[in-house]
Amino acid sequence: MSSIVRNSDDDPLVIAIQQPRIAIESVSPVVEEGAYPAKTESDRDLRLAARIFADGHEVLGAEVVWRRVGETAERRLPLLPEGNDFWSAQLRTPPCGRLYFRIEAWIDRFAGYRRELRAKHGARLPLDLELREGDELLQRCAERGGPEIAAACAPLAERLQACQSVEERVALWLAAQTGELLRLVGPREHLVRSREYPVEVERPLARFASWYELFPRSESGDPTRHGTFDDVIRRLPQIAAMGFDVLYFPPIHPIGRTHRKGRNNSLRAEAGDPGSPYAIGSEEGGHEAIHPELGDREDFRRLLVAVREHGMELALDFAIQCSPDHPWLREHPGWFAWRPDGSLRYAENPPKKYEDIVNVDFYAEQALPSLWEALRDVVLGWVEQGVTLFRVDNPHTKPLPFWEWLIAEVRGRHPQVIFLSEAFTRPAMMARLGKVGFSQSYTYFTWRNDKQELAEYFAELNQPPWRDCYRPNFFVNTPDINPWFLQRSGRPGFLIRAALATMGSGLWGMYSGFELCEAAALPGKEEYLDSEKYQLRPRDYQAPGNIVAEIARLNRIRRENPALQTHLGFQAYNAWNDRILYFGKRTADLANFVLVAVCLDPHEAQEAHFELPLWEFGLPDDASLQGEDLMNGHRWVWHGKVQWMRIEPWHLPFGIWRVRRVDA
């Protein structure tokens, strides 16, 4: 027989022999195979999982190996089998920053040996040969593992030799302490490693927060006087009493005068019209400056302190757009795309036009890299002032590589900074913004109104890829969006949307005036009449018909129920009425389980039979659950799976019930 010389570089047999015997699949949480980090928050249990299997009946061992960015020291967690080849571990997440993990798996000879020994011992089979095999396995481990392994194995070998009976030796081999020792020192045959996957750890505020937006210039209480930061400070107790965590301002910078907009977006401003705060920049300064009528740096610092004293944080608007008066046009004309006649094209976001705004050109020859660095420095400058939350205006109209770079630059130095994406655009772009680093995002929730589309949207956000890269912030309105539903639904409609937002996601927001049920619209448009973007709008926040108390109660319910502090865990349940959305949110251990029923009809009472999710507690259909109405504190016991409800929207268009086992 002639011998064949094989080239190991391209021989299929050699390549096959070198392939891993163990398969690692379906690793989670993973975004695009590790191209982008999955999202999580500090000080929580993060489930790391994978499907791991091999041929035959070999017993496998597996671990998660993880490290923090910038560290070389690795930490290990054992993965435990869940069934159907899935393995998982719970990692208590570290403080903010990037971490990396991989999965390692191997054939665990000692675990296989102990399993076989236990089975044969239980069947009362002769074990002399098996015990000799165990001794040889331990000896090989000591000989091949080096001095430290040999030293660790020696006490076990001595104890086995000292055993006086087969039963004693079997008991020692099967002892839990022996199993733990062998897990640590045993050979890891056919060891295979997954690639390394990134996870971005952010503050809990990135997942759970209630945002309140106001224009500080309207807080004077006088339609003829521009508001100040001190006026906002006087308002803080009211906002904090409603349970908000974040106070968010539109841009607070100087406003241009060229092409300044008048009331209701008029192309002509009258004397005294303040203009749109999004037309940033004048002779008083640009993105780094404060509008002089709001106050100065010292006033701003005093505001930041007051906001924190009321248990909130301040978020600023980062809008990359300039008025024609912005200092950058004089200082850096090469950052802009000039037309042949020497003019600049005004900004557009169809169908909207912004004649008072011009845009920078990110890829202009003179803008690379100085414009990018200047914008980064704007953000870092406000971080140095104490701002760690930024709502970013229309990020989908700026380059994705810019955002990925800027967010990494900022969070690399200040990992506590949170970025909210205000992008109402195509789903792929919204998801991609989350992947490149935005902590959270505005959503399509604003336009989801009927039962099917709400249930489908909430469920979609719980599934990949959204689940791991996108945190939805359910804003019920914005200065730009006066939703059709609110324009024609009256006070009950505002309560409906508040309930859906607060119960549907850990993140929700509202623009001031929502608590007063403001809905006057420009005819035929989803915009506010007398928009605050173009004029001062002082309000009576205690006006009759307000929903301040209900908002405060909803926010309190969120704080008291961990299941409601995330958009994850949504599960729709049966309620046999197309105008009632009925769903549940729960923690993994069922310690907190909240049911929510929302009447989607703001005008008519609705009734429905509905199912108590007894099966979620492992209970039969005739079992009972304790119920507690979280809006009024009433308690009772429900008996049986099918129940009945009636919701009258003029009283309260929703019900929120915490349920638990009767024997809990």
UniProtKB/Swiss-Prot annotation:
Whichever gene encodes this chain, its name is: glgE
Q: Which residues form the active site?
A: 393 (nucleophile), 422 (proton donor)
Q: Family assignment?
A: Belongs to the glycosyl hydrolase 13 family. GlgE subfamily.
Q: Which UniProt keywords apply?
A: Carbohydrate metabolism, Glycosyltransferase, Transferase
Record protein name field: Alpha-1,4-glucan:maltose-1-phosphate maltosyltransferase
Lipid biosynthesis as a keyword? no
Give its E.C. classification number: 2.4.99.16
Species assigned in the record = Pseudomonas aeruginosa (strain ATCC 15692 / DSM 22644 / CIP 104116 / JCM 14847 / LMG 12228 / 1C / PRS 101 / PAO1)
Gene3D superfamilies under this entry?
A: Glycosidases, Golgi alpha-mannosidase II, Immunoglobulins, Phosphotransferase system, lactose/cellobiose-type IIA subunit
A Gene Ontology annotation in the biological process aspect, one of them, is: alpha-glucan biosynthetic process
Q: Where does alpha-maltose 1-phosphate bind?
A: 261, 321, 356, 394, 533-534
